[in-house]
Amino acid sequence: MVNNRVQTLLNQLRAQGIKDERVLEAISRVPREKFVDEAFEHKAWENVALPIGSGQTISQPYMVARMTELLTLTPASRVLEIGTGSGYQTAILAHLVHHVCSVERIKSLQWHARRRLKQLDLHNISTRHGDGWQGWQARAPFDAIIVTAAPPEIPTALLSQLDEGGILVLPVGDEQQVLKRVRRRGSEFIIDTVEAVRFVPLVKGELA
């Protein structure tokens, strides 16, 4: 039984154009309050982004749903997430595919995310402390790559780790950011602009 707060959020997401029932089901099954600071628990099921420390945020549920829907996942999809953050987006993905790989630049965030995911009995996830700009070459290629912070341009390493027919979804830009979907067709990459967005920057190189 879905409680009222969850149902209200699902109704909002449908009204905003989210159609994939598998994505909506995953959102209903992941307790967002477990991924936010106690001070923000009362806002956990509101359709807003929230701070998680270290200058990072847990994305607005609409944006999580939109980006996940754009990946057109199947259970067999090999997925790479850049920016584990709180682990919330990771958990949504873990309900949709057999295995998720996730890279986080900030060690403390990676540690807390791993703890939360284990507490929720989500064990089909591999996390790595590393530079998201470099992806995860040892686990490539991927059918789907999702980036939860904005680089000024699309990282070439992520393009090279995308399998034939694969999809990369990411925000791109500095002050003016747009959500892009990149599809690989042989040696070509087809890029679609989806909508204007606002994300924290994808920091290059420096691990924290």
From Swiss-Prot:
Task: Provide one Gene Ontology cellular component.
Answer: cytoplasm
Q: Which gene encodes it?
A: pcm
Q: Where in the cell is it found?
A: Cytoplasm
Q: Which family does it belong to?
A: Belongs to the methyltransferase superfamily. L-isoaspartyl/D-aspartyl protein methyltransferase family.
Q: Which UniProt keywords apply?
A: Cytoplasm, Methyltransferase, S-adenosyl-L-methionine, Transferase
Major place of residence: cytoplasm
Q: Which InterPro entries match?
A: PCMT, SAM-dependent_MTases_sf
Keyword Iron listed? The answer is no
One MF annotation (Gene Ontology) recorded for this entry: protein-L-isoaspartate (D-aspartate) O-methyltransferase activity
Q: What is this protein called?
A: Protein-L-isoaspartate O-methyltransferase
Instruction: Please give a single GO biological process term from the UniProt record.
Output: protein modification process
The UniProt entry annotates the active site at 59
What does this protein's UniProt record list under function?
Answer: Catalyzes the methyl esterification of L-isoaspartyl residues in peptides and proteins that result from spontaneous decomposition of normal L-aspartyl and L-asparaginyl residues. It plays a role in the repair and/or degradation of damaged proteins.
State whether keyword Transport applies.
Answer: no
Query: Cross-referenced PROSITE patterns, in alphabetical order?
Result: PCMT
A Pfam family of the record is PCMT
EC code: 2.1.1.77
Q: Which reactions fall under this protein's catalytic activity?
A: [protein]-L-isoaspartate + S-adenosyl-L-methionine = [protein]-L-isoaspartate alpha-methyl ester + S-adenosyl-L-homocysteine
